[in-house]
């Protein structure tokens, strides 16, 4: 099913709703590929074991014609169905078969491709057949086979019907449900007239021409007035964030659903789609003002474009026709929204919460879960969907953020002079509590930095215990984690603000020592743990870095491309900092100036860590 059979509806609807159209019959081609037709044949005709059909079978094993393994191709205006064939004609005598015919080979059925009388289906009508030699030439076989085919071939193979009624009806219902109340009449008129006008076959696909009557629209008067966009109010920004969160929730739900039928290798692509969407969401919220477009609509379109290729692959893997049909209808409905994007408000369609729910229900119709549920809890299924392991150990309970600087120093002064030893595989809980209640100053570095180094050693040790990363890369990974923590925060989890201890936070909302964004990583990590537990924050950062090192740096062969094993650390950090698709940013000539600078600064720190000078992080203070 590489070519979704309703994908071209997006073009149809886009043409129909374009401004200044006259009333006319608009025709648009739609393609059905052989995967989809074969799945329908397996569902309706070849229903026996191993996709087989048995004709004139007397149950003795001595008389039958078996057809199996249907394959479809199209050329020259016709469809050609090939099957494996096995024929026996004889009688059972004394537990054995006395056979007049015992034949095995291939059969090919030539079929006309026609529009059904309901104008919402196409027909594959069998007009002739032949037996084939292994080289594809016509074979001579007994007339018995021809007689049986004439007499016993089922109606569903003589005339196979491919119905468009269900997806067209679903599409009409979906668009009617998300249309503006002021545009319902025009939308209903156009979609209600949708029928199949003609069909042709060739090039491996059946091309169906859909047609629809388009109502005329008025001519615009003059040029549209160009007006400056007014600044958004706080309430408008809150509503925008709600809509953006709905798009995020929709794709999170969809990605989890799609992953259940996907191959493990698809998890990397699913992660890229979700991470790119969430990074764009964060960028929109950083600068929500002055956007003339609809950010929620743009966010949907960009994410949809990334998801569709994965949907196509997963659709091919569906085990039955109904689920394949569901995927194709889902893709078609989403593509219609995609096509309507450039028309904006004139189309009378918006990417609303209700519309996203309706779209999700096309793919998963019987799920009781709200597709737009937007929770902050760790979601084990989402972690699995994106190629991560089990959730991290829970964070340590956090204390009130307020503190008095003098009393704080007094409480812990003695411990700073007598720091406790910490083994790589064991962390003293008292040390963790101290770090989680400490806003270090420049004079504290002789004590603070060795303690954080112990935390990072422990985190690396724990991360490597899962044996996801082979031993030859362990040192590089350790240096990577230390250098990334240095680059991101100078090993700091907290800063002082208005006499309170608060998590270190960037302008884009990244938090803690590893600068992890809660909106980007929602559902994969405990958000409170990221804020208030330095160990949990470090674990999350190491978890992400290892994932990127395995799936991008090593998976893409960066060390082989450059001939340097340290490129694995540079690649993993580029993906960590810029998103998975930036895994090769550190060596790309076309990388942004900012990206080049960030990668150069990281590599400088990495080399210092590699040479045993990780405590040079003190220069930050």
Q: Which residues are covered by each model-predicted region?
A:
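Bacterial N-terminal signal peptides that target proteins for export
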Residues: 1-9
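Extracellular/lumenal and peripheral-membrane lipid-interaction modules
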Residues: 23-400, 405
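Second-shell loop/turn segments in exported
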Residues: 26-27, 95-100, 111, 128-139, ...
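Sec-exported extracytoplasmic/periplasmic mature domains
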Residues: 42-46, 50, 154, 158, ...
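Non-catalytic cell-wall polysaccharide-engagement segments
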Residues: 392-434, 438-449, 519-621
């Amino acid at each position: 099913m590489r070519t979704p059979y309703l994908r071209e509806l997006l073009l149809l609807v886009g043409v129909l709703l374009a401004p200044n159209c006259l009333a006319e019959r608009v025709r648009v081609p739609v393609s059905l590929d052989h995967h989809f037709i074969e799945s329908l044949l397996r569902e309706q005709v070849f229903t026996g074991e191993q996709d087989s059909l048995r004709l004139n079978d007397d149950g003795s094993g001595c008389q039958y014609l078996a057809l199996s393994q249907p394959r479809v191709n199209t050329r020259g205006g016709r469809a050609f169905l090939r099957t494996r064939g096995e024929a026996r004609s004889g009688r059972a005598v004394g537990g054995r078969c006395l056979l007049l015919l015992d034949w095995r080979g291939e059969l090919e059925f030539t079929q006309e491709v026609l529009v059904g009388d309901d104008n919402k289906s196409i027909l594959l009508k069998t007009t002739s057949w032949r037996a084939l030699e292994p080289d594809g030439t016509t074979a001579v076989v007994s007339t018995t086979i021809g007689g049986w085919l004439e007499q016993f071939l089922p109606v569903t193979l003589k005339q196979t019907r491919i119905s468009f009624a269900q997806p067209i009806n679903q599409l009409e219902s979906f668009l009617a449900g998300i249309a503006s109340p002021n545009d319902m009449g025009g939308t209903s008129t156009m979609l209600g007239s949708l029928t199949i006008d003609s069909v042709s076959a060739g090039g491996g696909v059946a091309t169906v021409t859909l047609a629809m009557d388009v109502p005329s629209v008025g001519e615009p008067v003059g040029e549209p007035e160009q007006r400056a966009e007014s600044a958004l109010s706080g309430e408008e920004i809150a509503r925008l964030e709600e809509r953006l969160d709905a798009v995020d929730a929709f794709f999170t739900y969809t990605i989890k659903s799609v992953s259940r039928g996907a191959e493990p290798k698809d998890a990397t692509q699913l992660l890229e789609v979700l991470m790119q969407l969430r990074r764009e969401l964060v960028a929109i919220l950083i600068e929500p003002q002055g956007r003339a477009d609809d950010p929620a609509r743009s966010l949907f379109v960009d994410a949809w474009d990334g998801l569709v290729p994965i949907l196509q692959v997963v659709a091919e893997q569906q085990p039955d026709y109904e689920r394949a049909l569901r995927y194709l209808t889902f893709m078609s409905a989403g593509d219609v929204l995609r096509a309507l994007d450039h028309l904006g408000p004139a189309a009378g369609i918006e990417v609303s919460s209700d519309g996203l729910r309706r779209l999700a229900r096309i793919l998963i119709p019987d799920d009781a879960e709200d597709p737009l549920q937007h929770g902050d809890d760790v979601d084990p299924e989402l972690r699995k969907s994106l190629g991560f392991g089990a959730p991290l150990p829970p964070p340590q309970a956090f204390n009130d953020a307020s503190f008095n600087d003098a009393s704080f120093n007094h409480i812990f002064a003695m411990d700073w002079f007598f720091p406790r030893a910490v083994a790589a595989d064991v962390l003293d809980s008292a040390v963790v509590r101290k770090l989680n209640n400490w806003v270090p100053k420049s004079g504290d570095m002789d004590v603070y930095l060795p303690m954080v180094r112990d935390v990072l050693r422990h985190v690396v040790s724990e991360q490597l215990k899962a044996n996801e990363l082979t031993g030859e890369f362990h040192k590089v990974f350790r240096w990577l984690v230390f250098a990334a923590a240095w680059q991101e925060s100078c090993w700091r989890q907290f800063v002082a603000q208005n006499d309170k201890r608060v998590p270190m936070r960037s302008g884009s909302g990244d938090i803690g020592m590893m600068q992890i964004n809660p909106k980007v990583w929602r559902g994969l990590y405990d958000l409170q743990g990221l804020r208030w537990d330095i160990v949990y924050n470090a674990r999350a950062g190491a978890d992400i870095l290892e994932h990127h090192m395995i799936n991008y740096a090593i998976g893409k062969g960066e060390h082989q491309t450059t001939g340097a094993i340290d490129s694995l650390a540079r690649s993993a950090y580029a993906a960590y900092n810029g998103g998975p698709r930036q895994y090769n940013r550190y060596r790309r000539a076309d990388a942004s100036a900012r990206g080049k600078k960030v990668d150069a600064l990281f590599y400088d720190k990495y080399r210092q860590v590699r040479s045993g000078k990780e405590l040079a992080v003190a220069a930050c203070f």
